[in-house]
Amino acid sequence: MQITFSPSERRRRHATQNVSESLHCRVSRQNHAADQVLPPIQKRLDDFRQQRRVQAGSLIISVFGDAVLPRGGRIWLGSLIRLLEPLELNERLIRTSVFRLAKEEWLRTEPSGRRTDYLLTPSGQRRFEEASRHIYASSAPQWDRRWRLIVTVGELAPKEREALRRALFWQGFGVIGGNFFVHPSADLSAAFDALIAEGLANLLGKLKPLLAADAQFGNAANDVDMVHGAWNLERLAGMYAEFVERYQPVLEQLRADVQVDIDGESAFLLRTLLIHDYRRLLLRDPELPDVLLPAEWPGQKARLLCKEVYRRLLPASESHLDTLFQLANGQTPEASPLLLERFREADPLA
């Protein structure tokens, strides 16, 4: 018996077959790409794809700071979607995350015909440039053996105190005794500017910035005691150790297979995750001078590791961006020569 289908049923079956074939082709391409990728790199990419919860907004911030800023700080939304799609971030999630970043005044929109560019706001660019100075630094800060203090000299409401604590935490300040925010090398002027940018200008009249030197009295507490009182370095050390454990195999494979060219897409995706993971660590790191840190501090190894992996991935990842990075008008802006200055003075990790 011959079975016949209505026109609508035939269209539905044809569409289903096309979707099935498309998915089969996509899986085949992904499997073929996986065969061409170095195993530790593939593992890192797969680990990210298998996460149940992905903070897409935070990842997009990392992409803007690392890849978009050197090309003028703007990108067509469709291009951003294509760049992040291989990490299995769907279009809806990316659009929603970018919209939220615009509401938070990190980004703004600029239409061009039927397309839209997203670009950094002046305040967003200022925050990115400040973060870049920390992320791509070649060494730990030097210390003049003086402490920077911000002392509260007026009454603060509980909500004001918590907002102040959070804002200064992201600037690297620790807390001593509730009313003293301390750091060995922070820029006090920049810290006050950051408070203004966070909408806390009304608190400045209740804060006293100070520079303090060690009076060196006999059995008094020393600088290391100050560090232990102001920061929880044990937790941070564990996070750095996890970073090293995650990316050390990647570096070893890149070193061992220097004759094998990593493909541009994998280089870009790994570079993005590398900087994303490292940036999130630095947000929690007060960036203390080496002299104040414990011996064999894992943050030092993590910095050298990040530097070398990044420099090895840079050429292939930039070639990938040359291909997929577009503005709404169809142009592909060139990367700034300053990109090559990132981690410029990095010594190889022994």
Regions found by a protein language model. Name each.
Residues 105:
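Glycine-centered, phosphate/nucleic-acid-interacting loop/turn motifs that mediate DNA/RNA or nucleotide
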Residues 37-63:
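Short alpha-helical segments that sit at the start of domains
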Residues 133-176:
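Amphipathic alpha-helical dimerization/coiled-coil segments
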Residues 71-83:
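Short acidic, hydrophobic short linear motifs in intrinsically disordered regions
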Residues 221-350:
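C-terminal regulatory/effector modules of DNA-binding transcriptional regulators
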